[in-house]
């Protein structure tokens, strides 16, 4: 199973693709990883357009069975939520155009799936990603580590039969 994971952000969007191997213990290979960067000085339409184009290009290249995104929770940061929504919209349109279903997972679900408990630190989750992917070091920067964790989380829930598309 090939899964694209996305940590949505308008300035830094984590984008990772993994190939999950067989059954049994969760093991996977890293196929692609990057952080798509945009500048706050650019017009919004250019930032969103660049994110959309890059995500669509990766989806066409790797042909994942699913796109998994991190659900965002903003309590008092309305402007940040608004701008992250731009990035998420670009991802949703790219997934639609590529014909790939989209799934969303919250931070607690990611921690539970990869570390076995919902209160794991980011570093603990990154180390689990490193182990599952067989990497020498934990993925960096954090946006990439989060994107890969989200992709692996989808693989975990898909194996359990509990994954539901947006």
From Swiss-Prot:
A motif (Wedge) lies at residues 74-76. The keyword Magnesium applies. Binds 2 Mg(2+) ion per subunit. Mg(2+) 2 binds at residue 70. InterPro entries: RNaseH-like_sf (IPR012337), RNaseH_sf (IPR036397), X-over_junc_endoDNase_RuvC (IPR002176). Pfam families: RuvC (PF02075). It comes from the Bacteria. It catalyses: Endonucleolytic cleavage at a junction such as a reciprocal single-stranded crossover between two homologous DNA duplexes (Holliday junction). One of its GO terms (molecular function) is magnesium ion binding. Changing residue 73 to A: About 50% HJ resolution activity. Mg(2+) 1 binds at residues 7, 143. Its cofactor is Mg(2+). Its main location: cytoplasm. DNA binds at residues 10-11, 40, 47, 73-74, 76-77, 80, 83, 108, 140. It is found in: Cytoplasm. Homodimer which binds Holliday junction (HJ) DNA. The HJ becomes 2-fold symmetrical on binding to RuvC with unstacked arms; it has a different conformation from HJ DNA in complex with RuvA. In the full resolvosome a probable DNA-RuvA(4)-RuvB(12)-RuvC(2) complex forms which resolves the HJ. The RuvA-RuvB-RuvC complex processes Holliday junction (HJ) DNA during genetic recombination and DNA repair. Endonuclease that resolves Holliday junction (HJ) intermediates. Cleaves cruciform DNA by making single-stranded nicks across the HJ at symmetrical positions within the homologous arms, yielding a 5'-phosphate and a 3'-hydroxyl group; requires a central core of homology in the junction. The cleavage reactions can be uncoupled; the presence of a 5'-phosphate in a half-cut site is required for second strand cleavage. The consensus cleavage sequence is 5'-(A/T)TT(C/G)-3'. NCBIfam families: ruvC. Belongs to the RuvC family. HAMAP family: RuvC. This is Crossover junction endodeoxyribonuclease RuvC. It comes from Thermus thermophilus (strain ATCC 27634 / DSM 579 / HB8). The gene is ruvC.
